[in-house]
Amino acid sequence: IHTMGRDDSRSDLYRYPYEPTPYCVLERMANTGMIRKGNTLLDYGCGKGRVDFFLSAQTRCQSIGVEYDDRIYAKAMENKKAAASGARTEFVLESAENFPVPVEVDRVYFFNPFSLEILRKAMARLLESYYENPREIQLFFYYPSDAYISYLMTVPELEFLDEIDCMDPVSYTHLRAHET
């Protein structure tokens, strides 16, 4: 599958460029045990499907990727044909704010894919799904903006649980050595 490369050809003030999550970060997520075989992961701004394919393969979860850009969505669908975890992965061509969240979704991934305005609308859809079928839903944010964090802290249904250390151990050791 081909998921590399940044694509900002259709980005604007509301929808940010496609940039794949590094595999080392996905490995750390998979190794936390927070995503398992019985889970359904929703990946907002899925791009070419890296998060969906990797986590479906590593954790055996079901995965739904939502992408608004038809060109990038087409690349995800091409990748699905070649991916070993393609049968556990579904892609939907839709904007996040209009996507009705399926009641089985219990894990959600965001790599800062869109503006705060769109995040608010996506969260409203997510909460609608939660109230339709109450369940524990875990949200994962990779590089959340300060605006995201400020907003999320005002949503009464949310509770901060933990951070996953995604720093590269080699870089971290190097940084620590220079701090003394």
Show which residues each predicted segment covers.
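S-adenosyl-L-methionine
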Residues: I1-R36
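Glycine-rich SAM-binding Motif I of class I
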Residues: G49-F53
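Conserved SAM-binding motif I beta-strand of class I
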Residues: S63-E67
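Conserved SAM-binding loop
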Residues: A76-M77
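Conserved small/polar residues in nucleotide/adenosyl-binding loops
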Residues: T173-T180
